[in-house]
Each structure stands twice: as structure tokens, then as C-alpha cells.
């Protein structure tokens, strides 16, 4: 059981106001579902917030090909400045020019005007795999 606001964030979908880094991070290793709302009146003394029961089913091998650190960094970067496009956030993180950032997104079939909150779970997986291949595998 968690606060209602946390439950909304954990279980939200891309394109919604509640979708953020916590949602995308959980999606890498689990699936979540809101089971039950619990109003504040069910407690004594009543708290100032409502609660919800969330079911999280972990599957740490959901995406075995994904480097979890690079995925987390990709997600964190995408939501670093919500008002900025993904291109601008990637430019700052990877120290690349605008064209290279746009090419990176195009390679992943992601709109160059996209923001972090519009990316699906599979978009984040694809983007993190491409970033790893292009920036972190040249050792």
C-alpha cells in the first residue's frame, strides 16, 4: 500500500502527466497494476492523503539484453528537464550535436520532437541499446 499519488505514478502509461522516471524504471524489471483504492476515511486517525494497493510482479530477466545502468541513465536523462525535447536532453548527457542526437532518435524510430513522457517502455529499451552500441561499447 502506497499513497495514491505514488500509485498513479507507478502504474501510469506514457503520454500521461503521471508518467515519469519511476514508471519507466520499474517497467524495465516489473509490471505494475493498481489493485484497490483505499480512501483516507478507512484509517483512524485519518491521514491527509488517500492510499492505493499496487501489485508489482518482478521479472528481472524481462529485458536480459539491456544494460541496466545505461537504461537508468537514459531514463533519467529523458526526464531531466521535462520541458526540453529528448534531443536537447541527449545532447547534454552524451555531449553530441543536435544532428547526431536527431540521428540517434531516427535510428530508434522515435520522433525527433519527442519528450521523455511520450516514450514507451519499448522505446526506452531500444534507445538504451542503441546508446550502448554507439557510445559505451568502444572499450
Please identify what each model-predicted range represents.
Residues 1-116, 129-139:
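Class I S-adenosyl-L-methionine
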Residues 124:
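Short, Lys/Arg-enriched alpha-helical microdomains
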Amino acid at each position: 500500500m502506497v499513497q495514491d499519488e505514488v500509485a498513479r505514478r507507478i502504474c501510469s502509461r506514457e503520454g500521461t502527466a503521471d508518467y515519469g522516471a519511476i514508471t519507466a524504471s520499474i517497467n524495465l524489471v516489473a509490471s505494475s497494476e493498481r489493485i484497490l483504492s483505499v480512501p483516507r476515511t478507512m484509517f483512524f486517525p485519518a491521514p491527509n492523503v488517500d492510499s492505493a494497493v499496487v501489485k508489482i510482479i518482478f521479472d528481472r530477466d524481462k529485458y536480459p539484453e539491456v544494460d541496466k545502468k545505461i537504461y537508468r541513465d537514459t531514463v533519467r536523462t529523458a526526464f531531466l528537464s521535462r520541458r526540453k525535447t529528448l534531443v536537447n536532453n541527449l545532447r547534454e548527457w552524451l555531449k553530441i550535436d543536435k544532428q547526431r542526437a536527431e540521428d540517434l532518435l531516427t535510428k530508434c524510430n522515435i520522433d525527433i520532437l519527442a519528450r521523455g513522457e511520450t516514450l514507451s517502455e519499448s522505446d526506452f529499451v531500444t534507445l538504451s541499446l542503441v546508446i550502448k552500441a554507439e557510445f559505451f561499447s568502444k572499450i
